[in-house]
Amino acid sequence: MGQKKKKLAKGRLDKFYYMAKEQGYRSRAAFKLIQLNKKYNFLGTAKACLDLCAAPGGWMQVASKYMPVQSLIVGVDLVPIRQVRNCIGLTEDITTQKCRTEIKKALKTWKVDVCLHDGAPNMGTSWVQDAYQQAELTLHALKLATEFLTTGGWFVTKVFRGSDYNSLIWVFNKLFKKVESTKPPSSRNASAEIFVVCQGFLNPKRIDPKLLDPKFVFKEIQEVKKVDVLSEKKKVNRAGYEDGVTVLYKKGFISDFVNSNEHLQDLANFNAFEFDEAAKIFEQHELTTPEIKELVKDLKVLNKNDFQKIIKWKKAMAAYKEKLDNPDEEETEKPEEKKELTAEEMEENLQEEMKEYLALVEKKKRKEKKRQNELKRKHQRKIELTMHIPGDKIEETTDGDLYSMKGKDEFDEDIVADHSDISSDEFDSDDSDDDDDDDNNGDSKLIDDDEYLEQQLDEQYKLYQQRIRKKAAKLDDVKVKKDKIGQDGYNEDDEEFVEEQEESNPLLVGNKRKEPDAQAVSSLFFDNELFGGVEYRNPGDSESEPEQDGDDDQDDENNKPIDISKLKKQKPQAAQPITKKQKTTNSAEFGKQKSKYQKNPTLDDKDDQDDDDDKGNSIKGFEEVPVQEEVEYESDSDEDIDDKIKTKALGEFLIRKKSRQDLIDDSFNKYAFNDTGLPNWFTDDENRHNKAQTPLTKEMVDEIRRKIKEIDDRPIKKIAEAKARKKYRLGKKMEKTRDKASSIVDNPEMSNREKSKAIEKLYSGTDKKNMKPKKIIMIAKKSKTAGGGTGKYKIVDKRMKKDLRAQKNKLKTVGRSKDSSKKSKPSGGKNKK
């Protein structure tokens, strides 16, 4: 049978434990009260609350959060409670009169609307005693609640399921209108606790003291048996001695006891056994020990174990006697004689054994190979799903290996062997680190064991950062490609086609051409023949270079591929000074692109900056001048809108003195720490997760978002003026058209048909040829072919679009030449009437 698993402490660290840590609650029990309040909503309208057995203060935090502002909250416990905002903590015993006095001082003339109780006694004795102490503590809490609860108040308490549970429910029903038992989801299933919510305190003028007395409430009720007068009396049959027995002490013989099949009855009837002449063979047997001889002398004083020994000895003696009585029937086992094998048979046996052994070895190899392939497949799957980071593995070592520097090289080799599927960049970084370690091998022996472990953690964290940096670089490449597609004139459908083409098969990494980084592009750019005669200047030269103003453009060019053929065709030009207008234009464009691509800085920005500083400030003779920080222009992204909402809400908090002081007080919290010497991986994780909660409600955020939307939807002044002018011109035109139409209607010389045609032509404004709808030209997708159609849209490719544009321009020039020739000819012909 397997051993029973021992319950460990880490098994109790469930999701509510970590949620309490993240949200700043002092215990996971806070979520029990949150879920109870969500179901019954007793904290939303409460103005005063009394929390009994409140340590460490988790329920007080929840009450302060969900109760109205300026509510009175008092917490009582035997253990001192750390200060909770807007709460009063008392260190008293709820069973004493002193506790009642202190609560009255804290409440003054108030009556509480809600009384909470989440206390439990010291557990660890028997379950019956623990359950009784919990029920008794709940009754004391109820007694205290009846003194301070207002009419219609709530009482929420924790109760253990047990024999006293029904008694407590009976008492609750006497004092409250409605009593319900529930178990919130945050309460562990293994726990026997349940929560009783009592609603509508009756507040009677006089409460019977017996209702709150544990001795009376938990007293066991004994049912009184009813006396049956008509019951018949049963006559007891008394058993006497056996007939003809004159002596009560009986002795038996061992020979009869061994031969008897009813030995249990003999042990009950006889007081002792004697060894007679027939039992000499049993007395001399090796199993007949002095203990057996003493046991059979007095059978009435033996216990169960002694009787078992006698019965076991009796069976052994019976088998021994049967063996002596039938000696001829014993079959002697004779070993079989081994046949001598010939040389051929031995050779065949050897061949068969070899085949079996080879088959077994081959089977083990196949099994091991299958296991290795399965492990590799799982490992690769984890890497693809970003569930596992290469190099992020804790090696299991013994205590001797952990605290010694022996075998460090073998340990590093094992790490490299385990992570054979790491990319080439990671191998290069690992090799460089190993070379540095080999150079300083003599100094490494002096390193402390703790420092060695910290170095190992730092190396693992570097691999993790490289992984994040590569993912961020891929996202930047996708953004740059989108911009290139937009500059070439593609529409939104083409952008979606490019994204689908790139994301269709992310595993085919080898087929994609890697984009050149900034250093490779700059080296390729400066190796051109155009810069053959340029003289380089040192940073210390006093003369200023006009090219320094163009560094911003150079940074932008690093993100774009350079066409070498165009550079060769260009002629070298003399350096010209850049005007002030060009400087402002360049800086504005750089600021826009910077706000677009660096709006969300990653954790690796700081590391990239440090790496750039270590590399130096020159590339092949050219000095890299640090770019001044540009102002990031605002964008309409969701993150900027959230920042606006947060800023506006904090500004509203700063208007009033009380809210401003509360905001300043909240800034002094557990998140404000300034410890030095912490590792990078710890500080990065703290900065990402360990943040204080902003005091914003959902209603406040919705209201601010609505105001910002109203401001954004408001048109600018120029657009409003243009719309007004357009509306004014349209009104004037319609008024003029109405006047003309009325004059046509009043004309008596025109027939009704002529009038209708004239009015129709007047309102149409132009003839039907100009009113013919034009076809909208669309560029075909790469997945579609260009072709004609009779619908609203005409699908063309780039070449057809350019041809159509050229054809239209040619027709325009032909029309202009015809018009000029017509104007040169003298007018003639008949005039139309």
UniProtKB/Swiss-Prot annotation:
Residues 363-381 have a biased composition (Basic residues). Keywords: Coiled coil, Methyltransferase, Nucleus, Ribosome biogenesis, rRNA processing, S-adenosyl-L-methionine, Transferase. It catalyses: a ribonucleotide in rRNA + S-adenosyl-L-methionine = a 2'-O-methylribonucleotide in rRNA + S-adenosyl-L-homocysteine + H(+). The keyword Disulfide bond does not apply. GO terms for cellular component: nucleolus; nucleus; preribosome, large subunit precursor. Residues 382-396, 475-486, 557-566, 732-741, 751-767, 794-806 have a biased composition (Basic and acidic residues). GO terms for molecular function: rRNA (guanine) methyltransferase activity; rRNA (uridine-2'-O-)-methyltransferase activity; rRNA methyltransferase activity. Belongs to the class I-like SAM-binding methyltransferase superfamily. RNA methyltransferase RlmE family. SPB1 subfamily. This is pre-rRNA 2'-O-ribose RNA methyltransferase.
